[in-house]
Swiss-Prot record:
Record's protein name: Novobiocin biosynthesis protein H
A GO cellular component entry from the record: cytoplasm
UniProt organism field: Streptomyces niveus (Streptomyces spheroides)
Annotated family: Belongs to the ATP-dependent AMP-binding enzyme family.
Listed SUPFAM superfamilies: Acetyl-CoA synthetase-like, ACP-like
Residues the record lists as O-(pantetheine 4'-phosphoryl)serine modifications: S561
Function: Together with NovI, involved in the formation of a beta-OH-Tyr intermediate in the novobiocin biosynthesis pathway, an aminocoumarin family antibiotic that targets bacterial DNA gyrases. The ATP-dependent AMP-binding region activates L-Tyr as L-tyrosyl-AMP and then transfers the L-tyrosyl group to the acyl carrier domain through thioester formation to form a tyrosyl-S intermediate that is covalently tethered to NovH (L-Tyr-S-NovH).
Molecular function terms from GO: ligase activity; phosphopantetheine binding
Documented EC number(s): 6.-.-.-
Gene Ontology BP term (one): novobiocin biosynthetic process
Spans annotated as Disordered: 505-526
Length: 600
């Protein structure tokens, strides 16, 4: 039995029983009730629920023929597209496990994920296949090849039977694996069942007031679990999922995606929201912010005239654990209360319930808890612990987040216990950044930190103790980091220090680190080509400068991934063609100009 007394002492909501349904079953219910309604809008194409279902059924049969099936992983190396949505549904229909990969991540990172997960199949398209690492030894399904298209067209498009799958679907079966940042220097795969999906879907649809007339933005990166929130919020309500045809969504590209797609509902990280004006997206009636702490100023700007909700949840608890009610401009920003199907505990160091107002560690339990970390039994045992407030055999997840409970029951977030941070909606283990930089031969020690620039907001920065007799440059370190880390984990500043400051207990004293040093910019070399002139003008505007040199480094001037999106967009408007990772690999004006294509 649930320990109601302990639960009351912690002022937690007990786990509420919810229906058992798989992702495929949730989807197929809507297909039966709204077959002709628009399910996906992308690049000028509209697909009905019936059309998407038929394509997913054909692909599911192809995947089964190629070796997919219950318990087997299928890697999806696909950009944001209808291909990705249909592939997720197809894997679910086949009873297999989908592993989404972000093809914009470094090849070394993708290679590690594939080697660690060992999927039975890899699905991709021609545009994404070129970005994958070499030497992938697994069957590959190229979805847009003429040969595969012909095979798919010949397959039946009816819903699959249990006989075809080799058994019935079960919500408690492994459904998907998501890789998140890991403190050891390697990302870790979180293995989740579908047991928490029905409660998540019901909570999102109810809180966001999604109806069949709603248009929900598909914003999240394919490798980020918020992707599932968007699919579930749209598809369980019979709404339309708006899928932009671009990998870069912040600032003007995000504003245009919302405006052109007539998006009414979106789930966005606060950093992306902050790149727009509320007045620029009048159709956006419902906005959920999630992925990082929500500033009070953002609530003040965005709450008037629309439904604004703050949500919280780690990957290990099926995307979302708590949500607020509708926020007003003057509200204190909390992370709300647990959604149905989730229990929340705030405990002290002895795992006893914290008193109201007392800060403790946040623990989560419920049907949506992950099975654990792929191939990491020790880490799983460390983070998923027995739940003393519930029936024998139940577990709870140690989030590592600090929280307290207000008198009204809402939960306040107080940061992290460990070295994990949230940056622009992404989870970053500082230890992973430090581990990667420490592998550079000229680095004796590296410390990563989150530093708030008064003008530019939170920045990921690093401090490096050079190996004896070496002087690694910021450019060398950035290039090294970019080989192993995704864009959002590449530091924006590299500061050389003689030694890492320590606390009296011998631990790294992050508070004792100096302010990061931005490299002195060279002066005197002006633009020599039309492309360099265009980029110099953009750099001046982005960094509010009068003079600039073509050897100026974007990141050493304070640039970050959000500003990089702005840079790429402005360059494209001026006729320069640049790709998302271009700025990481070629951060100076002269380097960017040398590889950019200038349209006449």
């Amino acid at each position: 039995m649930f320990n109601t007394r302990a639960n009351k002492a912690s002022d937690q909501s007990p786990t509420i029983p919810t229906e058992s349904a798989t992702l495929a079953e949730l989807w197929e219910r809507t297909v039966r009730s709204r077959p002709s309604s628009p399910a996906i809008v992308t690049n000028g194409e509209t697909l009905s629920y019936d059309e998407v279902n038929a394509r997913a059924n054909r692909l599911a049969r192809l995947l089964l023929d190629e070796g997919a099936g219950p318990g087997r992983l299928v890697a999806l190396a696909l950009p944001r597209s209808s291909h990705l949505v249909i592939s997720v549904l197809a894997v679910a229909k086949a009873g297999a496990v989908f592993l989404p990969l972000d093809v914009n991540h470094p090849r070394e990172r993708l290679s590690y994920q594939l080697a660690d997960a060992r999927p039975a199949l890899l699905c991709t398209v021609r545009s994404a296949a070129a970005r994958l690492p070499d030497g992938i030894e697994m069957p590959r399904v190229l979805l847009d090849s003429p040969e595969r298209t012909a095979v798919l067209d010949a397959l039946p498009d009816t819903d699959l039977t249990d006989d075809e799958r080799g058994g019935p679907l079960a919500a408690t079966d492994l459904a998907y694996v998501i890789y998140t940042s890991g403190s050891t220097g390697r990302p870790k795969g979180v293995a989740l069942t579908g047991a928490g999906l029905p409660a998540l879907a019901a909570a999102k649809v109810a809180a966001m007031r999604v109806t069949g007339d709603s248009r929900v933005l598909q914003f999240a990166s394919p490798g980020f679990d918020a992707y599932l929130t968007e699919l579930l919020a749209a598809f369980t309500a019979g709404a339309t999922l708006v899928v932009p045809g671009t990998d870069t969504l912040a600032g003007d590209p995000l504003r245009r995606a919302l405006r052109d797609g007539r998006v009414s509902h979106a789930v966005l990280p606060p950093a992306a929201v902050a790149t727009m004006s509320p007045d620029a997206v009048p159709d956006l009636r419902v906005l959920v912010v999630a992925g990082e702490a929500c500033p009070a100023g953002l609530v003040e700007r965005w709450a008037p005239g629309r439904l604004l909700i703050n949500a919280y949840g780690p990957t290990e608890c099926t995307v979302c654990a708590t949500m607020t009610g509708p926020l007003t401009p003057t509200d204190e920003v909390t992370i709300g209360r647990p959604i149905p199907g989730v229990s929340v505990y705030i405990l002290d160091a002895e795992r006893r319930p914290a008193a109201p107002g007392e800060i403790g560690e946040l623990y989560l339990s419920g049907a949506g808890l992950a099975q654990g970390y792929l191939n990491s039994p020790d880490l799983t045992a460390q983070m998923f612990v027995p739940n003393p407030f519930a029936a024998d055999g139940e577990r709870m997840y140690r989030t590592g987040d600090l929280a307290s409970r207000r008198a009204d029951g809402d939960i306040l977030f107080h940061g992290r216990i460990d070295d994990q941070v949230e940056l622009r909606g992404f989870r970053v283990e500082l230890g992973e950044v430090e581990s990667v930089l420490s592998q550079h031969p000229d680095v004796a020690q590296a410390v990563a930190a989150l530093w708030t620039d008064p003008a530019e907001g939170p920045q990921l920065v690093t401090y490096v103790v050079p190996a004896p007799g070496t002087t690694p440059s910021a450019g060398e370190l950035r290039e090294h980091a970019g080989r192993f880390l995704p864009d959002f984990m590449v530091p924006s500043a590299f500061t050389t220090i003689d030694a890492v400051p320590l606390t009296p207990g011998g631990k790294t004293d992050r508070a004792g680190l100096p302010d990061p040093v931005k490299a002195t910019q060279p002066a005197g070399l002006g633009p020599r080509t039309p492309a360099e002139k265009v980029l110099c003008d953009i750099f001046r505007d982005l960094f509010d400068l009068v003079e600039i040199d073509v050897r100026s480094n974007f990141f050493e001037m304070g640039g970050n991934s959000i500003l990089a999106v702005d840079l790429i967009q402005r360059a494209q408007e001026a006729g320069l063609t640049l790709m998302p990772r271009t700025v990481i690999d070629h951060p100076t004006i002269e380097q960017l100009a040398a590889i950019a294509t200038l349209e006449e």
